[in-house]
């Protein structure tokens, strides 16, 4: 009878490890997809477009302390994007990396009517995947909203790895993931 107890314990540990890895793959993939979507949206804004930031109070000398900042990376624009960006997760599918056997999430729909030349072989596309990816994305936005705004308010290189791996620890295997854009 003792053997069954050890077997149950071992089975529980293995299932727990598998679930944790699946959960990490999901959150890592959601973070990386979120970064891709935000970078694309920011790039679509006219770089000449600005927004006034600062105090709209009139100083005693009659002047105002207002500063013009680029709209694309303004806190107002980023906050607006974060409110709706996770809806884009329905445009992603799940792919198992043959070498690592880990799940990756890849865009399966072109942006703004672009035709997709993507080979969809080996990519699972269904409402369960997009629903769980959207939920993971919303959780990330809720938990890391300040970090997302901080990172995207100024241009930076390698945002995916810096944000998803180093800052949030959502990805432990970021250097091994290829995450191609359409």
UniProtKB/Swiss-Prot annotation:
Organism classification: Eukaryota, Metazoa, Chordata, Craniata, Vertebrata
Protein name: Protein canopy homolog 2
Pfam families: DUF3456
Expression sites by tissue: Expressed in different tissues. Highest levels are detected in adult placenta, liver and pancreas.
Motif Prevents secretion from ER: positions: 179-182
Disulfide bonds: 28-171, 31-164, 86-137
Keywords from the named record: Disulfide bond, Endoplasmic reticulum, Phosphoprotein, Signal
The keyword Phosphoprotein appears for this protein: yes
Family in the record: Belongs to the canopy family.
GO cellular component, as recorded: endoplasmic reticulum
GO term, biological process aspect, one: regulation of low-density lipoprotein particle clearance
Compartments reported by the entry: Endoplasmic reticulum
Chain ranges of the Saposin B-type domain: 24-175
């Amino acid at each position: 009878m003792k053997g069954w107890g050890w077997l149950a314990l071992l089975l529980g540990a293995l299932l727990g490890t598998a679930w944790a890895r699946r959960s990490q793959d999901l959150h890592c993939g959601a973070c990386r997809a979120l970064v891709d979507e935000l970078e694309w949206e920011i790039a679509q804004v006219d770089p000449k477009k600005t927004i006034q930031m600062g105090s709209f109070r009139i100083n005693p000398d009659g002047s105002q302390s207002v500063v013009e900042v680029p709209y694309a990376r303004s806190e107002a624009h980023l906050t607006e994007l974060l409110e709706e960006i996770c809806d884009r997760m329905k445009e992603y599918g799940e792919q198992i990396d043959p070498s690592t056997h880990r799940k990756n999430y890849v865009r399966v729909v072109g942006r703004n009517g672009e035709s997709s030349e993507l080979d969809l072989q080996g990519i699972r596309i269904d409402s369960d995947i997009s629903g769980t990816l959207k939920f993971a994305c919303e959780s990330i936005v809720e938990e890391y909203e300040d970090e997302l705004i901080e990172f995207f308010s100024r241009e930076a290189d390698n945002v995916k790895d810096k944000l998803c791996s180093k800052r949030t620890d959502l990805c432990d295997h970021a250097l091994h993931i290829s995450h191609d854009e359409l």
